Amino acid sequence: MSIIRSERYSAIFLLCSAALAIIFANVLDPDTWHAVHSAVSEYHIFGLITPHDIVADFLLAVFFFAVAIELKHELVKGELSSFSKAIIPGVCAAGGILVPISIYLSVASVLPNGWPVPTATDVAFSLGILAIFGSSLPSKVRIFLLALAVLDDLAGIVIIATAFSVSISYWWIIVACITVGLFGFCSYRLARCKTSKTFLIIPAMLLCALAAWVSVYQSGIHATIAGVMLGIMLNRKQGAAIEHALEPYINGIILPAFAFLAAMVRVPHLPLDEISPALWGILLGLLFGKLLGISVFGIIALKFFRKKSISFFNLLVVSALGGIGFTVSLLMNELAFLGTPVHEQGVIAVLIGSLLSAILAIILMRCYKGRKSKSLPGRKGRVSH
């Protein structure tokens, strides 16, 4: 379990899953590929839900449940618990969202639905790359990246809830709010009840959580938002233990499974003039939009608020890592383009943009290590996860 909990191995699992998916999709003949794709996305288990929806809607809701727990912790007692702590990561996160959107819309204005795709940062992948290659960097770089990624996730949650919600059913939303409220009440009672009564409360919480997910799924809002609502309502005392318990399943099963399904596309053989502008918009948004947005907004914020929370070089490293959209960007791409010819090109753009951003970050971290090679040994405060 300790290996699966490791940020290093989490990034490796994700990368291997995406690579295997692309290889699998492109070695099959077209007829077999079409049959596999139809089975995953069109076959309804018991006439209720497709295998794709189980992963993209149900299992990813568990991931966003853990994200919400971490977000709540950071807002209450962590790196975002005060204005002075949150302002620099907040400004950087804003730049890392606004600039990629601007680049995307300037390149692909004919396909405006894809503007959210380059705004995401994959917290698991980016922290994994930092853990593998950034051992010589100060530990505050990881803290800054985590705060930035948490705010980025918050923005992603808002985008998913607003930009990708269709045919809203307010009746189901009311049911979802009631069940989430009951979940929060049960969580509150669980934190204060005697051990002998937990066998009644825990099943009630699970039933409320399942009912909340079904309600959100039926409401027209993306079902992952159910995970966010439940994570926010969970009692903070239980949050850390539950997040720790879920971590190996999220890192070892949920995220790799989604990465495999989302990246399972056939690489189209298109001439340069037939490539969709959405591909260029997503690719440039992730690679250059994140780099420029986070670094430039960060420099302005550091100067304006006269803070020294992170050096310019380390800010560049974080900016490059911010361009690793991967899992969340793949989800955004599905929501924006699934069922259209642009979808496959969007997946390729996310994968290439994330890979190039990771390579750029690795080069910067290697440069930092080279600059520090003459430093005295035994210095503390390094990234070591």
Swiss-Prot record:
TM regions (residue ranges): 9-29, 45-65, 87-107, 114-134, 155-175, 198-218, 220-235, 245-265, 282-302, 312-332, 345-365
Biological function: Na(+)/H(+) antiporter that extrudes sodium in exchange for external protons.
InterPro entries given in the database record: Na/H_antiporter_dom_sf, NhaA
Keyword Ion transport applies: yes
Presence of the UniProt keyword Signal in the record: no
Organism: Tropheryma whipplei (strain TW08/27)
Protein name as catalogued: Na(+)/H(+) antiporter NhaA
Coiled coil: none
Location relative to the cell: Cell membrane
GO annotation (BP), single: regulation of pH
Main localization (coarse): membrane
Reaction catalysis annotation: Na(+)(in) + 2 H(+)(out) = Na(+)(out) + 2 H(+)(in)
Molecular functions per Gene Ontology: sodium:proton antiporter activity
Topology in the lipid bilayer: Multi-pass membrane protein
GO cellular component terms attached to this protein's record: plasma membrane
Family: Belongs to the NhaA Na(+)/H(+) (TC 2.A.33) antiporter family.
Keywords recorded for this protein, A-Z: Antiport, Cell membrane, Ion transport, Membrane, Sodium, Sodium transport, Transmembrane, Transmembrane helix, Transport
